[in-house]
Amino acid sequence: MKQKTIKNKVELVGIGLHKGVPVKMELEPLEVDSGIVFYRSDLGVSIEFKAENVIDTTMATVIAKGEAKISTIEHLLSAIHAYGIDNIRISLDNEEVPIMDGSAIGYCMLLEEAGIVAQNAPKKAIVIKKSIEIVDEKKFVRVEPSERTIFDFKIDFNHPVIRQQHYKFTFSTQAYKEEIARARTFGFLHEVNYLRSKGLAKGGDLSNCIVLDESSILNKEGLRYKEEFVRHKILDAIGDMALLGMPLLGSYISFAGSHKLNHLLTKQILSDEKAYEVVSLEDKVEEAALDYAFLHEQH
């Protein structure tokens, strides 16, 4: 299995979820071993997508270099990771990634439009060798050794539409597009009002977020999946775990996990040499374990 990048440069214009201002985003190919690099075109500053560059995980994952920051990156990174792209430059002329429809499906379509090409170097992956867990009261995130890449997530909300939800996702690109990519971010009406009073969620509305009042959802079209809420948590987790710098080969298990806990988990994994092994994905067994099924791959 080879490293991959996109074939052609693509771009779009959207708005940021929290600041609500227009932003132009361009995706460009990068050479082998470049990794994922963000670029603030308005400031002329590049920011590598690495765990040590994360500065905030309160409402979204935010990375920075000096005064330059980029926020709400997790949905885009989720799609990039799910499509097996190792090397790509993401240029933005403002500080937020466009929110699109609150899910990752728009990014998937953009990546398919760009095309995906194999490069002349082997893809690498992080194989989990022992269990590592981050706990915050009842909440936890954990990775365990596994022959397949699995995301197993549970949530429990005191709300009649959500309540307890559980979803176990065995990773493949096609399954991601069908089962995970269309799950939207969600929030509660009382939280939206509070966030806006703090200058946040200015770009959020029913076109890019599931909004719930005390007893129901306000979106007239309803849900895209029965378990859309927990599926979106998996979407977020896939994007956050991309902070490892290469694909995860192991099981991710969580109850009520968050961006903060995911970030702490990636840092803990990378700080423990006995927790993981970096392997070259040239073995067919390892390749099958990740199952990047590229319907749109071009050579």
Swiss-Prot record:
GO terms of biological process kind: lipid A biosynthetic process
Domain of life: Bacteria
Keywords, ordered alphabetically: Hydrolase, Lipid A biosynthesis, Lipid biosynthesis, Lipid metabolism, Metal-binding, Zinc
Annotated Gene Ontology cellular component terms: membrane
Disulfide topology: none
Pathway the protein takes part in: Glycolipid biosynthesis; lipid IV(A) biosynthesis; lipid IV(A) from (3R)-3-hydroxytetradecanoyl-[acyl-carrier-protein] and UDP-N-acetyl-alpha-D-glucosamine: step 2/6
Names of required cofactors: Zn(2+)
Record keyword Lipid biosynthesis present: yes
Record: active site: 259
E.C. designation(s): 3.5.1.108
Position of the signal peptide: none
GO molecular function terms listed in the Swiss-Prot or TrEMBL record: metal ion binding; UDP-3-O-acyl-N-acetylglucosamine deacetylase activity
Binding site for Zn(2+): 75, 232, 236
Catalyzed reactions: a UDP-3-O-[(3R)-3-hydroxyacyl]-N-acetyl-alpha-D-glucosamine + H2O = a UDP-3-O-[(3R)-3-hydroxyacyl]-alpha-D-glucosamine + acetate
Keyword Metal-binding included in the entry's annotation: yes
Annotated Pfam families: LpxC (PF03331)
Its job: Catalyzes the hydrolysis of UDP-3-O-myristoyl-N-acetylglucosamine to form UDP-3-O-myristoylglucosamine and acetate, the committed step in lipid A biosynthesis.
Family per similarity comment: Belongs to the LpxC family.
Xref: HAMAP family: LpxC
Protein name as catalogued: UDP-3-O-acyl-N-acetylglucosamine deacetylase
